[in-house]
């Protein structure tokens, strides 16, 4: 490694020096053994001194680190050699880790990886997803054996998606058929006002889009666990999503103008193409005028919505009321709420109770919606509602419709090329048939032994979280006890649900029993999926909550926490290097999947998760003292991350409010994982070093943690993500969390006042 000014770390010995040390050891025996002890002490000075262990425990940890490294040797297995090569290639050892650890850990990765033309962002996560999709392609295209019905349906759906010649031949025909089903698209037909417009009702239109096409437009009605009683389901009413990814794009700031213009051109082009396909006159001026009205309407809707950073407190969002109160408070110029909701539920043969209650999340939006509805004609409303359905279905049509959105996607994401077809199809099938596809992935690529190993890691990190509560002087004993109870009650799901591999278990086939796919009807297959997903959700209203239900599929590179279930989920897709391998050193496992485990556990105690108790019910279990001080501790982190200015996103600052929950989880996760690793060593765990890397165990832990987040963005997507992503940009996830961790600056000998060892640190958990 190259020495850098201000890098106050002793240079580690190279291979030649190690060879000499071995010879000297044979000759000098005990004398050099003392020297080795001294050398190791110099490499890892006071590694645990600021982790608030007791003095006795601190001594045990340091002794364990010494003994472990003395007894271990360099790992030369294929897995270790691959890990060493990956780490070395990703690093930029010319950079000072105390100045910018992200560049030190990821500089090589950034230098070696160019963002593909199809991607708006490219990262370690994206590469893992790409590799997973290659596996899924193989199993979905494998025709050598017959599978159970659910799996065969997934393969048929995949083949229909790949059947591009038929998709091109059918062109806009399937979409035009759907437009008739939803009452027509006024801008793309003649005489709508005199025909379909005469019997138009907003309530019925919204209900059809919701129940038949899973499009919750204008009003977001959905079924989910009741926040106040997690054992039952309830109807929720909330503000909707919009056609563009963020409400900010609808406003007239200079940097949004290009996106708005491209969006309007996209809308206009699609409507014009559909008119031509029906042999209607082009009517360019009329089409542009009506699509401009649609954009104006959607802009007013965007203005009526509440920014996401102001919606973090679920206790402030939650308002329970019966249908009569809903109607009285939000009449919306005669909008019949009972008719709307009943029409949605009738699709699954569910009847509203006379005293049915709903939970309204979007009160400010509904208060603003009345004036908007009153300002626009039925024609403009229908143009907007159907546009949102058309927008969703563009990807299922022929190539010329995809080409119509090229400029819009370029303005929004910076991409100029569509994803290669097989990847698009693999992703689509996995998203819609996650259990069936997951069963294929598990059989092909997942080691079942990983489940027990990860479960042990969860227990180690959960134990550290509980012990860390004693270090918090901002939290009183009453609240600490409740926090401990909640942490101990967190349930985990690892890898996959067992039933997807059980041939005698009919649940997997029953999950897709209502679906019948055809290889030459990809568009209609997609409509079946939309309807099935919508109705499967709506049916839950009268069903008891299944606490063992998986909220995500197995073939997914991610992890999750559900506050309503107090449950953490680690799909099989993330249980792979660099996150996890039973064949790589434990420093990498703790810095990888260990950090992820700590991250998800901490989500149970972030600015949203803290509002739910050990059973997943929204309940205030905090004392006034602890709640007040939690807010104060949070302000430190909001300020810290809010001061990160991202040059790639036009020098916009990270939104410390909207990213708070993820920042809390990142900070807690890496802190818990590191302490759990030290404790594992102290308890006799024997780790191994990697060949070719003069790095201590602690340094390997932090480098693997950082390299999980290596990645780069296109400028357009950087601008979008800073508006919409609840996560901080990748490099600030690393820098922010490690700046706050004393163990990091100790491991790399960063002087106080250096960028990675700031004078003030933030800590919540």
From Swiss-Prot:
Root EC class: hydrolase
Q: Where is the Peptidase M13 domain?
A: 74-765
Q: How is it modified after translation?
A: N-glycosylated.
Q: Gene name on record? A: Mmel1
Regarding activators and inhibitors, the annotation says: Inhibited by thiorphan and phosphoramidon.
- In this entry, the parts of the chain located on the Lumenal side of the membrane are 41-765
Q: Does the keyword Plastid apply?
A: no
- Give me the glycosylation sites of this protein: 163, 279, 303, 336, 694
Keyword Protease assigned: yes
Q: Which ranges does the record list as Cytoplasmic topological domains?
A: 1-19
Q: What is this protein called?
A: Membrane metallo-endopeptidase-like 1
Report the cofactors.
Zn(2+)
Protein EC: 3.4.24.11
User: Out of the domains of life, which is the source?
Assistant: Eukaryota
Q: Which InterPro entries match?
A: MetalloPept_cat_dom_sf, Peptidase_M13, Peptidase_M13_C, Peptidase_M13_dom_2, Peptidase_M13_N
Species of provenance: Mus musculus (Mouse)
Q: Name one GO biological process term.
A: proteolysis
The residues that cross the membrane are 20-40
Tissue spec. comment:
Highly expressed in testis. Also expressed in ovary. Weakly or not expressed in brain, lung, heart, liver, kidney, adrenal gland and intestine.
- Where exactly is the site Cleavage? 62-63
Residues that hold a peptide according to the record: 121
């Amino acid at each position: 490694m190259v020495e850098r000014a201000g890098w106050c770390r002793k240079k580690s010995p190279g291979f030649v020096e190690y060879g000499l040390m071995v010879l000297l050891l044979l000759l000098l025996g005990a004398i050099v053994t003392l020297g080795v002890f001294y050398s190791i002490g110099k490499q890892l000075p006071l590694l645990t001194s600021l982790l608030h262990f007791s003095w006795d425990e601190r001594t045990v940890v340091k002794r364990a680190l010494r003994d472990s490294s003395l007894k271990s040797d360099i790992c030369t297995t294929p897995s270790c050699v691959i890990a060493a090569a990956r780490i070395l290639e990703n690093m930029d050892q010319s950079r000072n880790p105390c100045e910018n650890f992200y560049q030190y850990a990821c500089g090589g990765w950034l230098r070696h990886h160019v963002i593909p033309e199809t991607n708006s962002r490219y990262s370690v996560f994206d590469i893992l997803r790409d590799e997973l999709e290659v596996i899924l392609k193989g199993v979905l295209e494998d025709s050598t054996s017959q599978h159970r019905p659910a799996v065969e349906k997934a393969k048929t759906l995949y083949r229909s998606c790949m059947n591009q010649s038929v998709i091109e031949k059918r062109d806009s025909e399937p979409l035009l058929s759907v437009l008739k089903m939803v009452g027509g698209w006024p801008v793309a037909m003649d005489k709508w006002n005199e025909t379909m417009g005469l019997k138009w009702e907003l309530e019925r239109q919204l209900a059809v889009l919701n129940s038949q096409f899973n499009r919750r437009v204008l009003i977001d009605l959905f079924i989910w666990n009741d926040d106040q009683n997690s054992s039952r389901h309830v109807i929720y009413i909330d503000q909707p999503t919009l056609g563009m990814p963020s409400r900010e794009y609808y406003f007239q700031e200079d940097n949004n103008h290009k996106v708005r213009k491209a969006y309007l051109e996209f809308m206009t082009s699609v409507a014009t193409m559909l008119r031509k396909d029906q042999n209607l006159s082009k009517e360019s001026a009329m089409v542009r005028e009506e699509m401009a009205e649609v954009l104006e309407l959607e802009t007013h809707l965007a203005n009526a919505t509440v920014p996401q950073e102001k919606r973090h407190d679920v206790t402030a969002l939650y308002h329970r009321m019966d249908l009569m109160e809903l109607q009285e408070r939000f009449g919306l110029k005669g909008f019949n709420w009972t008719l709307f909701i009943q029409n949605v539920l009738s699709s699954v043969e569910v009847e509203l109770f006379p005293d049915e209650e709903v939970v309204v999340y979007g009160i400010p939006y509904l208060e603003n919606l009345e004036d908007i509805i009153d300002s626009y004609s039925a024609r403009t409303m229908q143009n907007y509602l159907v546009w949102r359905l058309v927008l969703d279905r563009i990807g299922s049509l022929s190539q010329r419709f995809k080409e119509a959105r090229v400029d819009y996607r370029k303005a929004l994401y910076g991409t100029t090329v569509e994803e290669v077809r097989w990847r698009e199809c693999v992703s689509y099938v996995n998203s819609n048939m996650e259990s069936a596809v997951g069963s294929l992935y598990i059989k092909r690529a997942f080691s079942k032994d990983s489940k027990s190993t990860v479960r042990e890691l969860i227990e180690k990190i959960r134990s550290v979280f509980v012990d860390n509560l004693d270090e918090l002087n901002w939290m009183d004993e009453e609240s600490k006890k409740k926090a401990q109870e909640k942490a101990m009650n967190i349930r985990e799901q690892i890898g996959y649900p067992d039933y997807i591999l059980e041939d005698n278990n009919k649940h997997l086939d029953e999950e897709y029993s209502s679906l019948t796919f055809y290889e030459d009807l990809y568009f209609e297959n997609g409509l079946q999926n939309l309807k099935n997903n919508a109705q499967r959700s709506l049916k839950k209203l009268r069903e008891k909550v299944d606490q063992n239900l998986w909220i995500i599929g197995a073939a997914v590179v991610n992890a999750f926490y559900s506050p309503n279930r107090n449950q953490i989920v680690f799909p099989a897709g993330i249980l792979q290097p660099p996150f996890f391998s039973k064949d790589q050193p434990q420093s990498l496992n703790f810095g990888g999947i260990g950090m992820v485990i700590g991250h998800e556990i901490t989500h149970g105690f972030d600015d949203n998760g803290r509002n739910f108790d050990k059973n997943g019910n929204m309940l205030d279990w905090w004392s006034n003292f602890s709640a007040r001080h939690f807010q104060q501790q949070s302000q430190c982190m909001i300020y810290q991350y809010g001061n990160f200015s991202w040059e790639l996103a036009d020098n916009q600052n990270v939104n410390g409010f909207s990213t708070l929950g993820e920042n809390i989880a990142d900070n807690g996760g890496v802190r818990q994982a590191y302490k759990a690793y030290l404790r594992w060593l102290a308890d006799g765990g024997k780790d191994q070093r990697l060949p070719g890397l003069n790095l201590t165990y602690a340094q390997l832990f932090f480098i693997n943690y950082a390299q999980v987040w290596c990645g780069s963005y296109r400028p357009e997507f950087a601008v979008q993500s800073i508006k919409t992503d609840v996560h901080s940009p990748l490099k600030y996830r690393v820098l922010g969390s490690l700046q706050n961790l004393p163990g990091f600056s100790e491991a790399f000998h960063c002087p106080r006042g250096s960028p990675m060892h700031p004078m003030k640190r933030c800590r919540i958990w």
